[in-house]
A protein has these predicted regions:
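Acidic, Mg2+-coordinating catalytic module of metal-dependent nucleases/exonucleases
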Residues: 82-89, 93-94, 98, 124-189
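A short, structured active-site edge motif that brings together acidic residues
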Residues: 104-115
């Protein structure tokens, strides 16, 4: 049986140029959370989301130089470990900058989107799903450990749904989640811009130029947006 580790990072922003300032994980009954100096200033826009300030990290060690680094690297890179995060590609990008490269991962965002076959869910961010699915947990939103506790409950809900839908046992459901997480997922509706709330397949027929423009914007973006790029190419038949 694979060892499941739920984790979350808080960072200086959401682009390729940003760095880790907090990491939290849950491994069985063990929970861990700590702050680190990211080596660059945390902008107020980021602090407003996760409430980690420059003053809180100014005397902290860099993550790669900390006493925690070796243990976390060994734990996350163990071939028997599956790391789980919401929008895991971003968290993987952040920890790969610290030379931590997990072998196996599950993205609860991609799994949630895959299970929503009819595209009925408006958005898939962690806190939205928490309240939509009425997940009961005593956790602070946008705090790394708080997000991890919500993540664990969401993972269990999604795993049980896959088990029920496909008549699988626990291990088979986990393998299915790994498989779903390994490739881009397709958005079915759009929740921003002039076509907010519309099906993407309808927009492709009515306003193909908008999707062409959006694809170009996503390709130029600084943050990884693999799912949107894959989705837009799908609807544009590229």
């Amino acid at each position: 049986m694979k060892n499941i580790i739920f984790f979350d990072t808080e960072t200086t922003g959401n682009t390729n140029n940003d760095f880790l300032c907090q990491i939290a994980y849950k491994n069985g009954e063990e929970t861990f959370e700590n702050l680190y100096n990211p080596g660059i200033k945390i902008p107020p826009e980021a602090s407003a989301v996760h409430h980690v300030s420059n003053k809180m990290v100014e005397n902290k060690e860099k993550f790669s130089e900390s006493k925690d680094y070796k243990k976390i690297k060994e734990l996350f890179e163990d071939p028997n470990t599956v790391v789980v995060a919401h929008n895991v590609l971003f968290d993987l990008m952040i920890i790969e900058k610290e030379n931590i490269k997990p072998k196996n991962f599950i993205c609860t965002l991609r799994v949630a989107r895959d299970l929503d076959k009819e595209g009925k869910i408006d958005r898939y961010n962690l806190q939205y799903l928490r309240y939509l699915l009425e997940i009961e947990v005593n956790a602070q939103a946008h705090d790394a450990l708080g997000d991890v506790l919500v993540l664990e409950k969401l993972f269990e809900r999604l795993k049980n749904k896959i088990k029920e839908n496909e008549n699988l046992d626990d291990q088979q459901a986990i393998e299915k989640m790994i498989e779903i997480s390994s490739h881009p997922s397709i958005f079915k509706t759009i929740n921003f811009g002039k076509h907010v709330g519309k099906k993407l397949e309808d927009i492709a027929k009515e306003d193909k130029g908008y999707l062409e423009w959006l694809l170009n914007e996503k390709l130029k973006g600084e943050a990884p947006d693999e799912d949107w790029i894959y989705t837009l190419k799908h609807y544009l038949n590229k």
